[in-house]
Each structure stands twice: as structure tokens, then as C-alpha cells.
């Protein structure tokens, strides 16, 4: 593994220049469109439109009886508990001799004479000269549909449900298919995460893309729903990895200051992709056409093979420096920067030279204290049992796992439940995607000012209360129900955005990946229930909303027992994780940014190649690079070592500030670029004068760890 920190490389070639912008937006497209279409196209492909029993004896009477009159004759009413009529039954019919009833009606038909009393009735019947048709008798015997169903084709020309009659006793099939899709995603997330770590992000991306395109197209030709479900299960292996891995590749090309921004923007891309799916569904109303339209075009993404590079962070982690050098040189050229040839090799030599020389210029092997320190055995590695063994960590972990389940179930449930709101399926789904966009903007602004804890609590509470309130809305006030459901979607989308930042900041560094992997798996198991929650709409339109709203409110109430992480030094060891938040106050609010002097120690630098094998179902940022933030400093003092606070622009990392001083780091450093790394352009990024650097260290910082870094820089100048 190379000793080069890629964030330090980005100081020279640009943290977010033209190259990163091009790659980021290309990767956003490849991450969000396939993922949104793959996960949510089934909302329209397997939609269940209004339906009722088919009565063959009445099929030829369309000229004599309207649709409503045929329903009134053949279908029993479904009544509410208060006895009020709700609607016609979808799965039951009167078990009578319809031929005899119709013949009797036609035989007794007499052309009525116009009178004052029945003039209106005659005008209504003048087209046929027939009296009003017979209507069903509630006392007639009732049976299940015997001859299939008739489907309302106002919104859909055809769906898998209408083709295969997956209604009534078979209405559980679409929910089961969705559940098996997410079973596949549980294992695919682990498998492709391992592939991405072992063979590279780029390799994993094209493997996932191949899997999705092939099986999505194959799904379009399913002869029955068993085959369809099997193919969807295999297709589930590619979700959410098809979203996760391109996004992580994009993040690994950027500097740490821009990763929060990148995380929010890709959320907006995903929401836009969902709205686009609704538009496609509206334009292409046949499930087969829609299925092909949401799979075949992604063949074009294979052209990325000649555009998208491998992650240079991953290449450096595998010590493939020459391959990373090619990418870095291209990055610098497009960003308008100039770096010397063999830039990474020279940087590695320089780093090794630093590591081989102690602060006073002596070789570390000659320092007995240094050898004694090196001989100390490292502390035992953290294990999943540490999540159970430590009470405070255990409490936080179980709350986070429950909140993860709540967010995942409610978000996906509200997305799929768009077809049960009583308005156009396309319109409801389209609005559901649009309301997510402002939720991300507001969350991005709020969570760095109000804190993660209260924003998570309030957004989950908002979404939950809105959904539960649907139980008080009259049945015919459909747009009130839709509005409340959209407020629920707004709240849960916002809470999901802040949750991924919060969960990474709460867990200690040594346990972060393992804990997130376990919590992610628990959330994935909980997610298997949401299709059946949505299916409960066959009994009551608002029942799924009530259940999901209750779950969201429960998540909001548990989240207030988590400590705030805004502007707080993040835990790194098991001991720090156990102490973190142990004495927090329930109704406390986030504090103002704290100075470096108030923190016990600074955070560890981020890993150059974070593991993907245990990432979350819906990841926003990579584990170490995005979540481990540095402590803030008092901006009233000109401290040259500013730390990254919550990933916000305007604060620079330790490596950037070291480069900004323009100082060489070893006595042997020379300006000759053939022998040492050129740092000339770094001086342009510095913001301090020589007079400021000459000020006494003890007047500028109080933290001894920061002072040591400055002293080491001074000694090498």
C-alpha cells in the first residue's frame, strides 16, 4: 500500500476542478438513472388498476346498459363499519342467473308515454325505449369472480397484473416480487462491495451495469410471474450497488471540502430520476414498453469504459502508482494545473524521507525512545462484540439500527404507495420525487446550524405526524390525503439525508465500518416488510400511511436519546465511543464551534481507500473520507492549521495548510524538481504572512498536538 495521501495530491492538481466536475456529473447520471428505474419501475410495471368481476352474460349489452348499470346489477357493495356505502366489490359478484334476469327485463320492456311525472325518465331512456334496468339485490348470494376481471384502462394500457390477473387471491404476488428483489440487494451489496475493494471501483461498476442491463431486459420477456420474480431477485443483486459504487468513485476524485455538497447534489439527481420515471410511465402506458425503455438505453453507459478512470485512491491503496500517475497527470492538465513528471513517485520518495527522519534531524533508529514506542504492540482490533459489550455504544447502536429501519421502510413505502392515494399514479409519483429536492436543500442548510440530532428528530416527526393524520381525512378528500402523504415524503427524505451523516459521526472510527455494515443489514431485513405494508391498502387506503407514520414517529422519539455531533470532536477509540454522549442532556442544543484547544485530540486522517464491503443500503458518502471530520478552530486567530468542519467549504485540511506554508519538510529538500517534489504552486494558496508565521506558537494555538506539527515545520525550514 502506498504511503501517499490522495487528499495531499489533490492540493496540487485541484480538489474540484473541471475534471472532477465532468466526472462527477457523468457518474451522477450512471448512478441515479439506473438505480431509480431499477428499484421503482415495478410501481408502474406491476400496477393494479381498478377492476371488477367480468360477467360474460352482460358483455354484449353495452348498447343497452351503461357500465355503471352493469356494475349495479352484478356487483355487491363493500360497506364501511358505519354502514355507509364505500364502493363496488373488486373480487365478488352476485351468484345469480344473469341470462334469465336480462331476458325478463327485455320481455317486459314497454315504450313509455311521456307524462309530467316521468318525462325525465323517458328522455333518459329514449335511446332504447327500455325501462330502467334491474339492479342487484343485497340478499342475493355472493361468490368470487368466476370469469376473470375487467380492468380500468384509463391510466394503463396493460400491466403485468392485468395480463396475468394478479388480483384478489393472487394480489400478493407483486408484493412478494418486490420483497425478493430486496433479498437480492442484501447480498449484492456485500458481494459487489467486496469486488470493488479487491478489483477496483471501475471494474465493479461495469460488472454491475452488465448484470442490470441483461437481467432487466430478460425480465421484460418473462412468460409468467414466477420467472419474473426470479429474474427480479437476481436483478436485486445490482441494487443499491449500481448507485453506490459510481458515487463513491466520484467522491474519491474530490477533496474532502466538497463531499457534503456532492452527497446532497446526487440526492437531488436521484429525486429527479424518480420524477422522470413517472413521466416515462405516463407516456409509455404498456408495461412491456416501459420495461424496455428503462433498461435498454443503459447499454449506452458502456461507453463510459473509455471515459471513466479507475479511482486513483484505490490504485494507490494497491500500490499501483504508475497507473494512478496517468490519471493524476490527466486530471492536472484538464484542471489547468502543472505537475512534474513522475509526480507521485517523487511525492512518495519525499514522504518516505520525512518518515525516515525525526523532528531533530536524527534517524529514528538512533532514538531509543522511538524504538521503544515502535515495539509496543498495537491495541486489540475492535470486534462486533464491542457493540454489545459497552452500554453506551450499545444504546446508540440499537437506536441507530431502529432509525435506519424506520427511514428505509417509510421512504420506500411512501414511494411505492403513490399508486394507492386515489389520484393519478403518475402524478402522485411525480410529485413524490419533486418534493424531495427542496427537502435536501433545507436539510443541507439546517443540519450544520441546528445540529444533526434535532433535524433528524423534527423531520421524522413531521413526516410521521403528516402520515398518521390521514386517518382523520374523509374518504372523498383525496387531495388532502395526497398533500399529507407528500409532506410525509418531504420529511422522511430530509431525515434520510441527515441520518447518513449522523450515523457515521456517532460511531467510533475503529467500529464504524463494522457497525454500519451490521446496522445496514438489519435495515435491509426490515425493508423486506414494506411491500406487504403497502399491500394493506386493499383493505384501507390510509392504513399503510398510518403504519408508516407511526414507525416514523417512533424513530423520531428514539432519536432524541442520541447525543449531538455538530462541532464536537468525533470518537475514534472504543473508550472515546463509550464516553461520547454519556452525559448529554435530553433537551440540549448544539454548541457553537469549539476551538482546537477544547478538543482532547485531533481526528485521524481519512483512509485513502475506504472499504465498500459493508456499506449502507442507501449510502451518501464513503465511511472514513466523508464522516471523520476535524475539529473547528477559533477564526479570530490566524491559525495556519485549519480543520475541516462538517465538510463545509472554507476550511482546509491539515495537508492543505501544510502545503500552503510552502515549507519543505526535511533538511534535504531542494527546489530541484528532479530530486524532490515541487511545491511552488502551493504558496499561492496560503493566506498567512511571514510576520504571522513568526509569531510565537503559544500565542496562536493552545493544542499541544497542533503545536508539535508547527514546530516540526519550523525546524525543517
Task: Tell where the protein language model's regions lie, with residue ranges.
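C-terminal transmembrane bundle
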Residues: 36, 40, 232, 236, ...
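Flexible cytoplasmic loops linking transmembrane helices in multi-pass membrane transporters
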Residues: 4-22, 78-172, 334-416, 584-649, ...
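Conserved MFS/SLC helix-loop-helix module at the cytosolic interface between two early adjacent transmembrane helices
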Residues: 187-209
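Helix-breaking motifs and short loop linkers at transmembrane-helix boundaries and internal kinks
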Residues: 200, 221-226, 284, 473-476
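Interfacial helix-cap and linker-helix signal at transmembrane-aqueous boundaries
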Residues: 49, 168, 195-196, 281-285, ...
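Conserved glycine-rich helix-kink/hinge and helix-boundary motifs of the Major Facilitator Superfamily
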Residues: 29, 175, 206, 260-264, ...
Amino acid at each position: 500500500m502506498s504511503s501517499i495521501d490522495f487528499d495531499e495530491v489533490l492540493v496540487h492538481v485541484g480538489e474540484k476542478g473541471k475534471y472532477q466536475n465532468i466526472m462527477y456529473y457523468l457518474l451522477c447520471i450512471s448512478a441515479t438513472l439506473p438505480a431509480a428505474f431499477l428499484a421503482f419501475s415495478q410501481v408502474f410495471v406491476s400496477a393494479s388498476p381498478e377492476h371488477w368481476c367480468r360477467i360474460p352474460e352482460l358483455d354484449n349489452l353495452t348498447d343497452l346498459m351503461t357500465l355503471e348499470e352493469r356494475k349495479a346489477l352484478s356487483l355487491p357493495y363493500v360497506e364501511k363499519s358505519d354502514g355507509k356505502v364505500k364502493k363496488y366489490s373488486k373480487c365478488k359478484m352476485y351468484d345469480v342467473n344473469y341470462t334469465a334476469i336480462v331476458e325478463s327485463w327485455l320481455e317486459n320492456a314497454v315504450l313509455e308515454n311521456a307524462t309530467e311525472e316521468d318525462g325525465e325518465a323517458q328522455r333518459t331512456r329514449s335511446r332504447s325505449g327500455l325501462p330502467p334496468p334491474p339492479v342487484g339485490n343485497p340478499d342475493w348470494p355472493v361468490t368470487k369472480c368466476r370469469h376473470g376481471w375487467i380492468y380500468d384502462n384509463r391510466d394503463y394500457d396493460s400491466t403485468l397484473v392485468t395480463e396475468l390477473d394478479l388480483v384478489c387471491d393472487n394480489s400478493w404476488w407483486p408484493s412478494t416480487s418486490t420483497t425478493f428483489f430486496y433479498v437480492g440487494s442484501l447480498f449484492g451489496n456485500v458481494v459487489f462491495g467486496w469486488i470493488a475493494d479487491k478489483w477496483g471501483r471501475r471494474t465493479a461498476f461495469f460488472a454491475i451495469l452488465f448484470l442490470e442491463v441483461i437481467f432487466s431486459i430478460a425480465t421484460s420477456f418473462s412468460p409468467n410471474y414466477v420467472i419474473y420474480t426470479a429474474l427480479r431477485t437476481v436483478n436485486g443483486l445490482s441494487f443499491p450497488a449500481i448507485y453506490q459504487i459510481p458515487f463513491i468513485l466520484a467522491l474519491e476524485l474530490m477533496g474532502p471540502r466538497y463531499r457534503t455538497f456532492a452527497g446532497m447534489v446526487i440526492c437531488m439527481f436521484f429525486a429527479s430520476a424518480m420524477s422522470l420515471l413517472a413521466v416515462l410511465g405516463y407516456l409509455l402506458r404498456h408495461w412491456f414498453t416501459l420495461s424496455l425503455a428503462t433498461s435498454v438505453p443503459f447499454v449506452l453507459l458502456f461507453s463510459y469504459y473509455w471515459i471513466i478512470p479507475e479511482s486513483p485512491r484505490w490504485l494507490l491503496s494497491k500500490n499501483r502508482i504508475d497507473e494512478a500517475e496517468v490519471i493524476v497527470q490527466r486530471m492536472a492538465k484538464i484542471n489547468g494545473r502543472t505537475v512534474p513528471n513522475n509526480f507521485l513517485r517523487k511525492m512518495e520518495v519525499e514522504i518516505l524521507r520525512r518518515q525516515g527522519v525525526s523532528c531533530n534531524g536524527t534517524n529514528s533508529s538512533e532514538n531509543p525512545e522511538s524504538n521503544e514506542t515502535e515495539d509496543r504492540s498495537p491495541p486489540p482490533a475492535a470486534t462486533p462484540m464491542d457493540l454489545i459489550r459497552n452500554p453506551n455504544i450499545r444504546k446508540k447502536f440499537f437506536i441507530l439500527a431502529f432509525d435506519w429501519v424506520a427511514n428505509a421502510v417509510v421512504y420506500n413505502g411512501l414511494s411505492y404507495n403513490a399508486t394507492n392515494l386515489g389520484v393519478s399514479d403518475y402524478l402522485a409519483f411525480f410529485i413524490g420525487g419533486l418534493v424531495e429536492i427542496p427537502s435536501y436543500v433545507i436539510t443541507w442548510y439546517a443540519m450544520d446550524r441546528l445540529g444533526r440530532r434535532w433535524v433528524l428528530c423534527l423531520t421524522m416527526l413531521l413526516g410521521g405526524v403528516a402520515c398518521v393524520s390521514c386517518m382523520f381525512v374523509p374518504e372523498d378528500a383525496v387531495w388532502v390525503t395526497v398533500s399529507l402523504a407528500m409532506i410525509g415524503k418531504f420529511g422522511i427524505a430530509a431525515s434520510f439525508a441527515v441520518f447518513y451523516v449522523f450515523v457515521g459521526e456517532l460511531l467510533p472510527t475503529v467500529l464504524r465500518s463494522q457497525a454500519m455494515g451490521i446496522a445496514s443489514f438489519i435495515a435491509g431485513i426490515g425493508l423486506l416488510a414494506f411491500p406487504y405494508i403497502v399491500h394493506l391498502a386493499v383493505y384501507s387506503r390510509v392504513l399503510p400511511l398510518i403504519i408508516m407514520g407511526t414507525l416514523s414517529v417512533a424513530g423520531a422519539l428514539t432519536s432524541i436519546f442520541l447525543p449531538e455531533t455538530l462541532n464536537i470532536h468525533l470518537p475514534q477509540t472504543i473508550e472515546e465511543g463509550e464516553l461520547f454522549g454519556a452525559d448529554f442532556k435530553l433537551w440540549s442544543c448544539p454548541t457553537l464551534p469549539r476551538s482546537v484547544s477544547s478538543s482532547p485530540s485531533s481526528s485521524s486522517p481519512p483512509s485513502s481507500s475506504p472499504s465498500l464491503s459493508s456499506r449502507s443500503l442507501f449510502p451518501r458518502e464513503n465511511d472514513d473520507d466523508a464522516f471523520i471530520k476535524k475539529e473547528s478552530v477559533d477564526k479570530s486567530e490566524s491559525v495556519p492549521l485549519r480543520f475541516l468542519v462538517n465538510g463545509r467549504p472554507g476550511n482546509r485540511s491539515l495537508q492543505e495548510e501544510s502545503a500552503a506554508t510552502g515549507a519543505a519538510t526535511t533538511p534535504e529538500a531542494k527546489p530541484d524538481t528532479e530530486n524532490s517534489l515541487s511545491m511552488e504552486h502551493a504558496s499561492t494558496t496560503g493566506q498567512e504572512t511571514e510576520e504571522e508565521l513568526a509569531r510565537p506558537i503559544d500565542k496562536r494555538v493552545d493544542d499541544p498536538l497542533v503545536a508539535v506539527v508547527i514546530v516540526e515545520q519550523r525546524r525543517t525550514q
